A protein has these predicted regions:
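Extracytoplasmic/periplasmic substrate-recognition and gating elements
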Residues: 106-177
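Non-transmembrane alpha-helical segments in soluble domains
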Residues: 58-62, 83, 151-159
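Loop/turn elements at helix/coil->beta-strand transitions in domains of secreted/extracellular proteins
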Residues: 9-15, 67-70, 88-92, 108-114, ...
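Beta->alpha turn/N-cap motifs
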Residues: 96-101
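Glycine-centered hinge/linker elements that transmit conformational signals in sensory
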Residues: 20, 25-76
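Sec-exported extracytoplasmic/periplasmic mature domains
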Residues: 62-69, 156-163, 197
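C-terminal capping/gating helix-and-loop segments adjacent to ligand/active sites or protein-protein/ligand interfaces
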Residues: 184-200
Length: 200
């Protein structure tokens, strides 16, 4: 009870605090997805979206946030609440984007942390799952474009080059060197990258 309020709030010390979309990693970490392609190539709702793993994960998080003293869901303040708590040493784990280590934790002179992938659903899950996060960019081609095939080819080319050339460079030159300075976190980034999933 770091705030001496005699009630649980985001100013206390916890194992885990999250808010908003920062909890999405748990959904994807369970192996679930929102949509997928069917046998005809059409995008449909994934059966995992309402599956048992998602229900169990939500129940586990609700127990953590509302029925224990180990976690809290911050309803006000968004990401800075858990980012600052982590940087002040009041938080054991947080889920967030990689850039937080550079722009939020570094100014707090907090560098005693490790990167780990989102936990597996259970010990039987074969691999980790990491989503790119909700702030990723989606591209569309206007219906009145003069040459939709060429526009599609252009976007596909840049997506391919980004995946094969840009993404490895970002991981090797930024995430594994600029954002962390220990070999264990660098290895963890290799695990994260090897298990990235896209929800389409």
């Amino acid at each position: 009870d770091g705030t001496k309020s005699y009630s649980k709030d985001s100013g206390d010390t916890f194992a885990y605090i999250t808010s908003g979309t920062y909890a999405d990693g748990w959904f994807y970490g369970s192996g679930a997805s929102i949509c997928e392609k069917n046998a005809d190539g059409d995008i449909v709702a994934s059966p995992t979206f309402k599956g048992e793993r998602v229900a169990n994960t939500v129940e586990m998080l609700c127990q953590l946030f509302y029925n224990s003293n180990y976690g809290v869901y911050a309803t006000e303040g968004g990401g800075p609440v858990h980012q600052n708590a982590f940087g002040q040493g009041r938080l054991l784990f947080m889920t967030d984007r990689a850039r937080v280590s550079h722009y939020r934790l570094a100014p707090l002179d907090f560098d005693d942390f490790l990167i780990v992938p989102c936990p597996k659903y259970d010990k039987d899950q074969e691999r980790y799952y990491t989503t790119m996060g909700n702030p990723f960019t989606l591209y569309a081609i206007p219906s009145d474009t003069d040459n939709p095939k060429m526009a599609s080819a252009f976007i596909e080319c840049f997506a391919s080059e980004g995946y094969r050339i840009v993404t490895p460079a970002v991981f090797e030159l930024s995430l594994k060197t600029r954002y962390v300075d220990d070999p264990v976190s660098a290895m963890m980034y290799d695990i994260v990258r090897a298990n990235i999933v896209y929800d389409i």
